[in-house]
A protein has these predicted regions:
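Conserved nucleotide-sensing/catalytic segment adjacent to the nucleotide-binding pocket
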Residues: 102-140
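P-loop (Walker A) phosphate-binding loop of NTP-binding proteins
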Residues: 69
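Conserved lysine of the Walker
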Residues: 74
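N-terminal pre-Walker A segment at the start of P-loop NTPase domains
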Residues: 33-51
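Short beta-strand-centered segment that lines the nucleotide-binding/catalytic pocket of NTP-utilizing
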Residues: 87-102
Length: 187
């Protein structure tokens, strides 16, 4: 059974006031609990602030699975995230290289674009398994790697509505939930 533990909505009918609404979904006693937080970005600068907040709480071993349609903002979010953690000025989308790596202050940062993969097995050739343990991973089009994607990750669904960009972030453990709650965006 799925029960909504908490939902915050603005009283004038607008969903997700200012920056975030917190939604906790409990999937029963024997199942993993998911925690969701939704962030609203009106400008590219808002997206930059949000990406920087996430990069500030990122830890070695974190995987950010970035879902969204073409043009949703996956590469833009990734660029700001990477620039905040490294000296990289230019952060091109890895559309053709499939992966770009960057030396961060405390760990390596891997930026994947899986759009062109034909099967999950092709991700092995990119060294994806090693990167899961050796750094922070930003994965665009994670649905292309299917079963290779670990369970305990940051799931980021990006979508647009009424000229705003929304980032729906889901985590499934207490430690990530604490980091999500301390993010500092829109507080």
């Amino acid at each position: 059974t799925l029960s909504v533990a908490a939902t915050i909505l603005q009283s004038n009918g607008q969903l997700f006031p200012k920056a975030a609404a917190f939604l906790i979904l409990a999937h029963g006693l024997n199942k993993m609990t998911e925690y969701k937080k939704i962030f609203k970005c009106l400008t590219e600068n808002d997206t930059k602030k949000l990406a920087c907040c996430f990069s500030n709480v990122a830890q070695k071993g974190d995987i950010f699975a970035l879902y969204g349609t073409l043009g949703a903002g996956k590469s833009t979010f990734s660029r700001f995230f990477i620039q905040n953690l490294s000296d990289a000025q230019e952060v091109p989308s890895p559309t053709f290289t499939l992966v770009q790596s960057y030396e961060g202050n405390d760990f390596e940062i891997y930026h994947y674009d899986m759009y062109r993969l034909k099967s999950p097995e092709e991700a092995y050739e990119l060294g994806i398994e090693e990167s899961f343990y050796n750094g922070v991973n930003l994965i665009e089009w994670p649905e292309k790697i299917g079963y290779l994607l670990p369970k305990n990750i940051w799931t980021v669904n990006i979508f647009t509505k009424d000229s705003a960009r929304y980032f729906e972030v889901t985590v499934s453990d207490e430690e990530k939930k604490e980091r999500l709650e301390k993010l500092g965006y829109g507080d």
